[in-house]
Design a protein with these regions (language model features):
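Catalytic domains of cell-wall/extracellular-matrix polysaccharide-remodeling enzymes
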Residues: 171-250, 256, 298, 307-310
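Short C-terminal domain-edge/linker segments immediately following a structured domain
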Residues: 89-94, 158-162, 197, 227-230, ...
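Terminal accessory/targeting
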Residues: 1-145, 238, 245-332
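Structured helix-beta-strand junction loops
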Residues: 159-160, 216, 292, 332
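Metal-dependent polysaccharide deacetylase catalytic core of the NodB/CE4 family, i.e.
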Residues: 66-70, 106, 110-204, 302
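Glycine-centered flexibility motif
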Residues: 22, 165, 229-233, 294
Length: 332
């Protein structure tokens, strides 16, 4: 329904049939597939045994909307006037990156390593989506890839074998022709080919916009989740090829369904869950993915899990929730 959109041009989960019918939390296509395979086995058409519940791959993805809290002169002035004062602001501004409350990347990688040690290194990947463009107010903060701090973050990614994807700007979401330019800029700064993408604000607006991802050389897109409801937007927990609705062509572009974005769970305008409810709902989705032998894509922003100060963060338990989910995956 092209006429039903929020202020960012997104079709929301609460408007979808799966949500209204009460099965957004189920990978319904995977369930149908399992049922059909069972019938085929009963009819002796297919002899393959159904696999036991098992998550094929875990993608720990992190959108780097705001990599640092207080690393520019503007930030320093802001925190001196409105924050905790000059002394504390100066420590964040002038000290090592580890003193910045938004620099939570080492902790995130530590969680990945814990999970990899149990389930295997090939079944778990860390993926940081980094912006390289955008001038909209919704693209703030506008950070520079060539800055000393960003270069240090990119070096950290290289050292820790973290994959880097393009976090397409809000502007590029509205004008998809900009995607190629942003991708090329990120590639120049990283020195590597970039083939993964996620749209800022999860703002994948129209189906035909996927053509621009193809043209830019994107092979895998991780945008396919609703911002307002965690669950299965595509009805499946498995990666699927995009099908161009205009010519019915099966595209080489692969869409990875996003199961859980942390702010979908807690934001008052979205699901508005408390910690216990968020953990229970997330655990339910994880079990559904395992039952379907799918892949689990999680999205936690680096600035949502800060422990020292909570600027613009609605709740203080997202770090605790992420750690609990990692433990749940280790157990299962």
């Amino acid at each position: 329904k092209r006429n039903i959109r929020d202020i960012h041009g997104r079709f929301l989960g609460t408007e979808s049939l799966p949500f209204k019918a009460g099965f957004i939390h189920r990978p319904i296509v995977d369930e149908y597939g399992k049922l059909l395979r069972r019938w085929l086995r009963q009819a002796r058409v297919q002899s393959a045994v159904e696999l036991p519940p098992h998550i094929q791959k875990v993608w720990l993805t992190h959108d780097v909307d705001a990599p640092f809290f207080c690393r520019t002169f503007r930030n320093l002035i802001r925190e001196t006037v409105k924050g905790t004062g000059l002394k504390h602001a100066w420590k964040m501004f002038q000290g090592p990156l580890q003193e910045d409350p938004f620099y939570t990347f080492p902790w995130l990688v530590k969680q990945r390593n814990k999970l990899k040690a149990v389930i295997g290194k090939n079944r778990c990947e860390s993926l940081f989506f980094i912006k390289s463009g955008g001038s909209s107010v919704y693209d703030k903060p506008h950070y520079k890839l060539h800055s000393k701090d960003l270069q240090e973050l990119l070096l950290f990614c290289k050292t820790e074998k973290v994959q880097i994807g393009l976090h397409t700007s809000y502007d590029a979401g509205k004008t998809p022709a900009l995607i190629s330019t942003e991708k090329e800029l990120l590639e120049r700064q990283t020195g590597k080919s970039v083939t993964y993408n996620r749209h800022h604000y999860l703002a994948s607006r129209e189906p035909e916009d996927m053509v621009w991802l193809e043209k830019a050389g994107i092979t895998d897109d991780f945008t396919m989740g609703y911002p307002d409801v965690a669950g299965f937007r595509l009805g499946t927990s498995r990666p699927v090829h995009w099908i161009n609705p205009e010519n019915k062509r099966i595209s080489p572009l692969i869409l990875h369904p996003l199961a859980i974005m942390e702010c979908s769970l807690n934001e008052p305008v979205y699901m508005n869950l408390a910690y216990e409810g968020a953990l229970a709902y997330s655990t339910q989705l994880i079990k559904q993915v395992a039952s379907a032998n799918g892949e689990l894509v999680l999205l936690w922003h680096n600035d949502s899990i800060t422990t020292r100060i909570k600027p613009n963060v609605s709740v203080d338990w997202q770090r605790k929730l992420f750690a609990a989910i990692i433990e749940e995956l280790i157990k299962s």
